[in-house]
């Protein structure tokens, strides 16, 4: 089966696992998925990320994070730039997700960054997704 948007599939798998209160999620690896998973870990949306190497492309294991009473840390994920409609923003036009409570993940010339990091480095890029 050919997948036209592996990033949207990755975000949907995270959203579905989160809604079902799963602890661990495994997805086929790619460099951009690894980058997105590392940003989610760095920003505190997931507990941990493991990269499992195999003889094929590898697997990313994402450990989802919940609050003490089981409340979800990730309340929303939204794919912004899609294969059919790419969305690019200049540095001065970078969005703030929920007035700074969420993050925007961008693909820039400096690599994958959050909106806050892109503002600090003074770069714009393709808006991959919003996470809040």
UniProtKB/Swiss-Prot annotation:
Coiled-coil segments: none
Keywords assigned: Ribonucleoprotein, Ribosomal protein, RNA-binding, rRNA-binding
Pfam families linked: Ribosomal_S8 (PF00410)
GO molecular function: rRNA binding; structural constituent of ribosome
Domain of life of the organism encoding this protein: Bacteria
One Gene Ontology cellular component: ribosome
InterPro entries: Ribosomal_uS8, Ribosomal_uS8_CS, Ribosomal_uS8_sf
Record GO biological process: translation
Protein function: One of the primary rRNA binding proteins, it binds directly to 16S rRNA central domain where it helps coordinate assembly of the platform of the 30S subunit.
Family: Belongs to the universal ribosomal protein uS8 family.
Quaternary structure and interacting proteins, as annotated: Part of the 30S ribosomal subunit. Contacts proteins S5 and S12.
Protein name as annotated: Small ribosomal subunit protein uS8
Originating organism: Streptococcus sanguinis (strain SK36)
């Amino acid at each position: 089966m050919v997948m036209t948007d592996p990033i949207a599939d990755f975000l949907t798998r995270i959203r579905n696992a989160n809604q079902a209160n799963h602890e661990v999620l495994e997805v086929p690896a790619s460099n951009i998925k690894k980058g997105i998973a590392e940003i989610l870990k760095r920003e505190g949306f997931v507990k941990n990320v493991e990269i499992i190497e195999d003889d094929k492309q590898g697997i990313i294991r994402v450990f989802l994070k919940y609050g003490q009473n089981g409340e979800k840390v990730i309340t929303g994920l939204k794919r912004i730039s899609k294969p059919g409609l790419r969305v690019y923003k200049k540095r001065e036009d970078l969005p703030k997700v929920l007035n700074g409570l969420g993050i925007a993940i961008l693909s820039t010339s400096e690599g994958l960054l959050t909106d806050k990091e892109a503002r600090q480095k003074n770069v714009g890029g393709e808006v991959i997704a919003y996470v809040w």
